[in-house]
Regions:
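Alpha-helical segment of the N-proximal tetratricopeptide repeat
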Residues: 1-28, 38, 42-49
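A contiguous binding-surface segment within folded domains or other stable secondary-structure elements
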Residues: 102-126
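TPR/TPR-like alpha-solenoid helical repeat scaffolds
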Residues: 146-153, 172-193
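Structural marker of alpha-solenoid helical repeat scaffolds
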Residues: 32, 66, 100, 134, ...
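Helix-start (N-cap) detector for alpha-helical repeat units in TPR-like alpha-solenoids
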Residues: 3-4, 37-38, 71-72, 105-106, ...
């Protein structure tokens, strides 16, 4: 029961914004009950949120050793790999997350970004299309999908992305048009203030 007291204290400290103190309390709970993987998951999540990705990794791996079907933990592990530039490992983790939970849009998004970082733009487009389909109002997924199509020199698909994105986020649409150097589409966003 004592491990729960440390867990609840840590949870409160985390909610109040005391990240390091909450980690210390979660670690105390783990010393009492090492198989209390909720604590490992929270520690990993906090460390990743602090940008301490290498420190977060072993905690995510501990969670996954106990619960290999945890799609969110696979996603979070992929995120830590992606942030460290370890894109092949990120792809493996994101792929497992999407296999376990095919509607986990953020895993598809991360998968697309990791493929793009490796220059695998066709695979990136496939993953980003899934992310955009699952979250049709996510301008970042649509922007990245448009850039993947631009890199693949698929003007028709990129134009379709621009037209879709224009309906709900003209500013991101303008950014996509500029970044893709598609001045032929400037007329769509000419009324936006610079």
């Amino acid at each position: 029961m004592e491990h729960w007291l440390f867990y609840l204290r840590a949870h409160l400290l985390e909610a109040l914004g005391f990240a390091q103190r909450s980690i210390t309390s979660y670690q105390a709970a783990l010393r009492i009950k090492p198989e209390f993987h909720r604590c490992s998951n929270r520690i990993a999540y906090i460390l990743a949120g602090l940008g301490r990705y290498a420190e977060a990794e072993p905690y995510f791996l501990t969670v996954l050793a106990a619960d290999p079907g945890n799609a969110s933990a696979h996603f979070n592990l992929g995120y830590t790999y992606d942030k460290r530039g370890e894109f092949e490992q990120a792809i493996r983790a994101f792929s497992e997350a999407t296999r376990l939970h095919p509607k986990l849009d953020r895993a598809w998004y991360g998968l697309g970004l990791s493929h793009a970082a490796l220059g695998q733009h066709d695979r990136a487009a496939n993953a980003l299309r899934e992310a955009a389909t699952l979250q049709p109002m996510n301008p970042h997924a649509w922007y990245q999908l448009g850039m993947a199509y631009h890199t693949l020199q698929d003007r028709d698909k990129m134009d379709a992305v621009v037209m879709h994105l224009l309906r709900f986020d003209p500013k991101i649409t303008r950014q996509l048009i500029r970044d893709a150097k598609r001045s032929d589409l400037d007329y769509l966003v000419k009324d936006l203030a610079a």
